[in-house]
């Protein structure tokens, strides 16, 4: 798939913008705070209806305006798909093929994107919440069912935590209702864990191949999904469900005392190993960056395998964080494969030599000027 164009109205520092893209590599040149990252963010928001940079949608709407509109014409193997997203005081409205979608979950999954920015190196070394968010955002694009289960799980988790606090304060006494919430949470949690394990197994294979090539077969990358459900990777959804049910029963007194749900996919983690050692704890900075790069490149192939379409790749000032060898591997891997958007202060060195016929835009104060091809 590729994004043919983008039309923005009152998004971040863009009052009005219409821009046509190349199917290959699109380079956004400019100094900091000119709007390069905002443009990549707009593509991400058009795809997922939410930002990867902020949880507050009000920040996405231009100062002293009330509504932001994003439009794009997407091309897939099945044909052209016009997309439109409106962000306003009353929430979000999304259209596909000019038809308003009843639920945002019906909209997500049309345009698939993968973003790789310096902060994505924290996939490896950051807190568990970073890796859970990574799994949820990527797997949610690949599987509408995963997205649905995740939405239901979060709703019930919020209700259950609220009820646990009421029990803790003795504002409620009915533990039968707690059992109902626990059963519902276990059902959706089991689906989430099972799908995570299934997709991680595939992602690991792709990432191992990339990692082996980058390290010239000197290192082996492994994934380990950390969960309180024993042998979850070898069992069915039903077994995970029954195990979660039993664990919630065992932990009931402790959870009431603490007023929160202590186990489930919202507490799970993903660990990376290199040659048998935990790379988060014992890996060098170079190993951590190679791991992050391998995972990101593996996502491209996994998304193609799961959806039938290559995603759009957003590289936000990430070249500055990679040495020449890793830059070379990244740019060679994406060449003539996926539509790519790359932000950078300047295009030189490895990037200038390796990128084949890029479409280059100069970004300054929220305006874009296309460079003449060399």
Swiss-Prot record:
Q: Biological process GO annotation list?
A: DNA replication; DNA synthesis involved in DNA repair; double-strand break repair; SOS response
Give the UniProt subcellular location, in the record's own words: Cytoplasm
Residues that hold ATP according to the record: 30-37
- One of this protein's Pfam families, by short name? SMC_N
PROSITE patterns linked: RECF_1 (PS00617), RECF_2 (PS00618)
Molecular-function GO term, any one: single-stranded DNA binding
Disulfide bonds, paired cysteine numbers: none
InterPro entries linked: DNA-binding_RecF (IPR001238), DNA-binding_RecF_CS (IPR018078), P-loop_NTPase (IPR027417), RecF/RecN/SMC_N (IPR003395), RecF_2 (IPR042174)
Q: Which GO terms describe its cellular component?
A: cytoplasm
Q: What is its main location?
A: cytoplasm
Q: Which UniProt keywords apply?
A: ATP-binding, Cytoplasm, DNA damage, DNA repair, DNA replication, DNA-binding, Nucleotide-binding, SOS response
NCBIfam families referenced in this protein's UniProt entry, alphabetically = recf
Functional note: The RecF protein is involved in DNA metabolism; it is required for DNA replication and normal SOS inducibility. RecF binds preferentially to single-stranded, linear DNA. It also seems to bind ATP.
Q: Which family does it belong to?
A: Belongs to the RecF family.
Record-given protein name: DNA replication and repair protein RecF
Q: Which source organism?
A: Lactiplantibacillus plantarum (strain ATCC BAA-793 / NCIMB 8826 / WCFS1) (Lactobacillus plantarum)
Origin organism lineage: Bacteria, Bacillati, Bacillota, Bacilli, Lactobacillales
